[in-house]
Structure formats: C-alpha cells, structure tokens
Amino acid sequence: MAVISVKPRRREKILQEVKNSSVYQTVFDSGTTQMQIPKYENKPFKPPRRVGSNKYTQLKPTATAVTTAPISKAKVTVNLKRSISAGPTLNLAKKPNNLSSNENTRYFTIMYRKPTTKKHKTWSGDGYATLKASSDKLCFYNEAGKFLGSSMLPSDSDSLFETLFKAGSNEVQLDYELKENAEIRSAKEALSQNMGNPSPPTTSTTETVPSTKNDGGKYQMPLSQLFSLNTVKRFKSVTKQTNEHMTTVPKTSQNSKAKKYYPVFDVNKIDNPIVMNKNAAAEVDVIVDPLLGKFLRPHQREGVKFMYDCLMGLARPTIENPDIDCTTKSLVLENDSDISGCLLADDMGLGKTLMSITLIWTLIRQTPFASKVSCSQSGIPLTGLCKKILVVCPVTLIGNWKREFGKWLNLSRIGVLTLSSRNSPDMDKMAVRNFLKVQRTYQVLIIGYEKLLSVSEELEKNKHLIDMLVCDEGHRLKNGASKILNTLKSLDIRRKLLLTGTPIQNDLNEFFTIIDFINPGILGSFASFKRRFIIPITRARDTANRYNEELLEKGEERSKEMIEITKRFILRRTNAILEKYLPPKTDIILFCKPYSQQILAFKDILQGARLDFGQLTFSSSLGLITLLKKVCNSPGLVGSDPYYKSHIKDTQSQDSYSRSLNSGKLKVLMTLLEGIRKGTKEKVVVVSNYTQTLDIIENLMNMAGMSHCRLDGSIPAKQRDSIVTSFNRNPAIFGFLLSAKSGGVGLNLVGASRLILFDNDWNPSVDLQAMSRIHRDGQKKPCFIYRLVTTGCIDEKILQRQLMKNSLSQKFLGDSEMRNKESSNDDLFNKEDLKDLFSVHTDTKSNTHDLICSCDGLGEEIEYPETNQQQNTVELRKRSTTTWTSALDLQKKMNEAATNDDAKKSQYIRQCLVHYKHIDPARQDELFDEVITDSFTELKDSITFAFVKPGEICLREQ
C-alpha cells in the first residue's frame, strides 16, 4: 500500500489538488475529510491486451520498489510498495519513425483503402510496410513516405499476406516482400522523405515520467505532476489547416505557382519510354505505362502518340526524318482548335484494339494539367484526364474487347462494364445510370451499336459525365440518316476515336459524314463541301471529262487540299509492316472451270432477262448480278432467287440445272478440304457471302464426316464468342463456316491457318476483313488464303473491280505505296463495262490473265516494264480540246481512247498483281502449296489457271 507523509499545514492544499484530479477521488463522510486512494495488491502484473491480438505488452520496471523520502517544498516522494515480476518489456517510445537502413528490417509493398461496404472493393493507394527483427509490429506508410499507422503481426505467420490489417482509419493488406536491392533502396528513399515529420500520436502512447535515481532507488517528482492528468498533447501540424482534403492541390494562384508536379512514371527508370507531346500550358509529362509500352511495336507506338495528339487538340509536328523514332521525346506543339477526334484507319491486324486500350489507360491515369486534379503530397496526379469512357462496337466484338482489356491490363486494374444479354431493358438502363454516377467501380462501358439505342435516354441525361467515345468498325456510321449516328451526335462527346479498316471506297458523301462526326465543322457545311470538293473531284473522275485538262487539274487541286485537311487527324498504315512480325502468308487465286449446267443457266437467264443495255444501270441490274453470282456458286440456288422467280421462271431448261448442286468451285472446295484434313494437322475457315451457299457446303462437309462449327447472322450474339473460343481451342473441330457480312468483322480465328474465300463481294473491304481473320497477331503457323473464282463469268469481273476499287481510299487515306494520280482520277468501270459484265467467256483459261499478260503460265514472276501511259493520255487530252474536229478524226480519236482505256485497265490490274506467279496447270504442276500439289491429279481438269503469291518460306516437305 502506498503511504503519503504530509505535514498538517499542507493537508488542505494537497486535498484541493486531489479533489481536482481525475485519478483519485476525495470523499467527505460525516463531516470528516478522508482521501481514498487505490490499493495495490502484491500480485503479478497483467498488462493490457489489444482487441484481436493474443500478444501482451508488458512493463519492465527500472526499480522493484520506491521508498519514502521527506517531502521538500517542490517535490513529494511516493513509496509504491509493489512487487513487479520480471518479463517482456513494453517499448513506451513514440511511433517508429527511424527509417535508417537496418539490415534486420524487412520491407513490404502494401495496398490501402478506407473501410467500405461496397461489393466490389478497390484499393485507393499503394505504399510500404516495415518490420524490424526485434519487433512484432508492422509500420505502414503511403507511397510518399507518410506514416499511416501500425498493427501487430497475426498469430499465424502463414496468413501474413492474407490478413487485412487496421492502421488508423485505413484497411491495409501486404502485397509482396521486397527482396531486390534496387527495390529496397527505392523504398528507403520514399520513406526517408518524411523522416523529419513526427509520427501522429495515438491513444496508446504514454508520456514517460522524468526521474532521478538516487542511492535508495527513489523516484522524485513534483507533487502537482503526481496528481495531475497524464494526458497527451494534441499534435500541432506545421501546415496551415484548411477545409479541403489534405491531398488536394491548393487552388490559390500563389500556391499553384509554388507547387511542383511530377509525372506518374519516372522516365529515367523506363527502357525506351513513350512520352506524349504537350502544349505550352502542360504542367507535367504524360508517359505511357511501361506495363503496356513494352509490348507495343514501333508502328503502334507512333499510333498511340498520334491519337493522343488528336484528342488533346495538338497540331501535327513537323518531322524531318520519319525513320527516326520520336516517341521517346516530348515535343511542345501548338494547339489546333479544329481537332478533338481521330480516325485510325489502319489495315486489319495492325493492333488497333491494343493501341486504343493503351490510349484509354493513359487518359484514365494521367493528365498534363496536374493543378486541375487531386495530387499526392509529392505532386503526383492521382486521377487522369478522363473518368468515364464509352466504347461502342458490333455486338460480336463486345466479348473480344473485354478479353483484350483483361489480357493487357488485368480487370483488377480497370473496371470494364458490359451489359448482359439476359438483362431486361430496365436493368440495362439502371446499369448505365450506375456506371455514370458511381465513380470508382467502372471506368469503361462496352456496348453494342443496337443496344445503344435502348439506353440512349440514360446516356443523354448524363452525357456531361462521358469524357471519351470509342467507335469500333466506325465505317458503320457513314449513313448520315442513321439513328445510331444521330444518337452519338446528341451525346456531344468532345473526344472521339473511330477505328476502321476501310472508311471509304468511292463515296465522298459518306466520307464527309464520318469526318464531320469526328471533328464537327472542319470541312464546313455539307453544301460548301459539295461545292468545293465533291463536284470538282467527281467531274474529274467522270470518263466523259477524261481529256478536259482544266477539269482534271481542278479536281487534282481539290483532292490535294482535302488530303492536307484530313491527314491532320487520319492515320492509315497498310499491313505490309506486319511481314516481319507474322508468319508468312501465301495468297492463291484459283480459276475454276464452270460445269455445263452453269453455262446453260447463264444463257437462259441472260436471254430471259431481255436486257436493254441502253437503259441499263448498275442499280437497276443489281438483282440480276446477284442471281448470276449464285449461279457461280451452285445452280441449285437459282430456283429460290426472287429475281429469277419474277423475271425468268418460264425457261425451258429450268429443271436441268435448278436441281444440280454441283459447280466448279464446289468441286475444288471439297478437294481442298479433303487434302487439308488428310495431309496436314491444320484447321480451315470457309467464307461465303450467302447463307444458302453455307447450307450447301455444310451438308457436303457433314456427308464427308468433317467436324465443323458455323457462325452467321442467325446465331445469337451471346453464343458467338463461345463458338469462336471453342474453335480456337478444341483440336477436334476441323472447319469453321463463316458468313462474311454477319461474322467476318473483328473475329480472331487464329486457330486456323488456312482460309478459303468461296465467293467475292463488290465491296473489297468485306473480303479483306474476312481474309484477315487468320493472319493476325497470335498466329503461329504459316497461312494460306485461297480465293475461288469461276473462269470467264461474273466472278472474274468482280475480282477485276475489287483490284481497282481501292484507288479513292488509297488516295485520301495516304497509302503512299499505291498512290497513283491517274488511278485516282478515273473510274475504271463505267456504264459501258456493264455490257461486258453480263458476258460469259467460255473459251478462256482466265480473262484476267488475258487482260494483263500473254505469258505461257510456267510459274515465273513477270516483271512489267514502265509504260508511257500517262504521256499518251495527256496527248489525247490536248488533241481532244481543239476547236474543230472532222468526223473521220473524231472516230479515230474515239478508237484511240477506247484502246487507251483498255491499256490503262491492264496496267492497273498488273500493278495489283505484282509479285504473283502466273501458273497454267496444264503446263506447270507446282502451285507452291503442298495441298494443291498433292491433289493435282483430281484438280487438273477443274482449275484452269492460278495466280500465286508465295510466302517467305516454302512449306513443301521434301
């Protein structure tokens, strides 16, 4: 029991001090003043235990007893006769802030957040944790070195990284332990930044009592200190208190100028970094996350930087040497107020999706204007320029987009929302509403073009929250009257990115619609655009004005002017740059001999149609063209054709060919499929533009016992992704039947290395999209592309038109390798060509080869000499502009013009077939493909001619 000896005259003063103390109480009973103090029992000391911990913190005394001493004027001696057992000690020092390098200290990385009841929790920040060998306490710091709190180790050491620790007002979890010297050094540097700042006090911190130990082991202290409250003073911050969040940058101009900002990534610690360009107002560099940057190829690095410049409204830089890599340097550029969107028109397979994801991730995490967002204490922006991004794409690509986000970023880093096909309309609207209003859960919404219309009302209400729009397969927006396009316009999203492989073929009206959506007003109104560009360019391309020098020069001038405007925000590269990254690809065009039933069907249809070539136009003859294309595939498709039923149903020979399923192309197809199945271990994709044709092919494959799957317009959207995945992963599936128009866009079918294009489409982009399904990133095997064409029929005319139709697209989208002024100025197939379109050449091995070459087809690559075609054309122009011409001279000029046109067509087709070998199977039995060569005996009578463009290596096994 502790006894206090006090003189009588000081009793009242002491009692007054005791009365004011919260530790002791003064009780007055029966008019007698008596002080009662706690009684100390002589038993082992039991230290306090933290809730949730099984470890005790014990006190180690410096003396076992305190004896009584006379009280001086300023001091009082306390004799606490208490026996304290020896044992583990409690460290009563302040929170650990000693961050010096200690070999016995372990370092960890951590993730922390505020406690939340959300279903999908996210971490708000990263930091470090330290653990000294002599301590059981983890100390937590944020990435700037600020102390967050501490927590005791769990009893089970195996659950160290699964335990959710409580540190101050945060939940903390260990990520991994730092082992590398460089990592430990970086952690020490980060923690040493705040060494001078005292750690925040906690309720468990106790103030130590200063004492002087005399010979008797006594503690002497002031009397007032003995009975006063033992409290901790509130920590007074050295910074001025504000009502704003401590990490928010002060908004006063004076503080903003004094604040120094730093990029999210240190450019000095990244190998070959990608540093974005900026304007003069930028406060910090934007550097592409090395997590993605290390996977980007050179053309993709340039693409990401180009798109960033466009969306940030930066003018195009002047690059003196395009071969020099400028992606590692940040250029200060002028602002371009006309531009806020970009059209990425790269060929299929160049990685447009990866480039887009890289741009999205960069804008979500970083911004060049750090003073406008919340920053850490060290001046690093905590949020990016964009918070909500809308991705609109065909429904077949929704799953692919989400997989790509997961592949490159991991969905734990970025929140990606897709609307389930099982949702009701109300559920979709609620999901979109929550996406826009809840900030941290999702950053990207991927939605199909059709679904966009059903949730347009919710998007319209909160359109100010959408920071960026991405439209995949953006050429779908070329129709100005489209509801989808008008819905997207109503959202008024400033930053827009359109992705497409073929944005334009031969229609400047569609081109204007797309460009005006990306950057509104950059081409003026449609009326002014039509007056300044469409009319002059169209007149220059009209064959009736081909010799009018004035019109041609004006058209060329307007074309150059348009190119100068659009190249500021359009990027177009061909897939030729992929040759060094992908396996070799062999292109084979096979001309298949038509069956006699097909020839009979052609004659009956053309006679029954009673064509008037004087009034014939392409639009009016479209039904007949479709019917003739079906005959090329199989005569059995004729009976169900609408045009045939309404115009030619009374022909005498209808039954002789309408019941026949055989055709030259079907014979070659089934022989190829059998050769691929028996001679290789590869898979094959068969593409057609008609589901009826796919039905016939599917029946033939079933009869041959060939396992396959099919994707066309009748397949529900929710099943398409699983069909593609099953084909790519299941080795038991041999074939994939694909509808070019319904499923040929954006699909990744790298499980197959051979593709057969059974029929052609007027639009070359449809066929190019379909053929690029297998030769793309992820393909490991050499690829073979087969195009089947019926000899001498409409199939060949379509092929010839396809070879030339890209001229306008190449001109305005910058395919420099194929750019040719003459090819861009002329429509190679005018109305007169329709007459030839409906003719059947039965006496030729290949009408296309007859147009361009007279070789013997021995498999040699033909070198074409440069022609004087342009000079001849200019001469004809000059001669045609004279004031008067006789009838004889006029007839002569017309004949020369016709000859000149034929020569031009031949020249352009030759240019498109450069590097192709010309093979006549009757003279040469090596077609540079083991499957065709091994099946040559069966195919010799079915293949009349072939164009082959071999890959880099010969796959023929010796």
Swiss-Prot record:
Keyword terms: ATP-binding, DNA damage, DNA recombination, DNA repair, DNA-binding, Helicase, Hydrolase, Isopeptide bond, Meiosis, Nucleotide-binding, Nucleus, Ubl conjugation
Sequence ranges of Low complexity compositional bias: 202-212
Broad EC category: hydrolase
Region (Disordered): 189-217
Compartment list: Nucleus
Annotated motif DEGH box, positions: 506-509
The keyword Secreted belongs to this UniProt entry's keyword annotation: no
Gene Ontology terms: cellular component: nucleus
Cystine crosslinks: none
GO biological process: DNA geometric change; DNA recombination; DNA repair; double-strand break repair via homologous recombination; heteroduplex formation; meiotic sister chromatid segregation; reciprocal meiotic recombination
Molecular function via GO: ATP binding; ATP hydrolysis activity; ATP-dependent activity, acting on DNA; DNA translocase activity; double-stranded DNA binding; helicase activity
Binding site for ATP: 380-387
Cross-link entry Glycyl lysine isopeptide (Lys-Gly) (interchain with G-Cter in ubiquitin), positions: 649
PROSITE patterns the record matches: HELICASE_ATP_BIND_1, HELICASE_CTER
Assembly behavior: Interacts with RAD51 and DMC1.
Similarity remark: Belongs to the SNF2/RAD54 helicase family.
Additional free-text comment from the UniProt record: Present with 1270 molecules/cell in log phase SD medium.
Identification of the protein by name: DNA repair and recombination protein RDH54
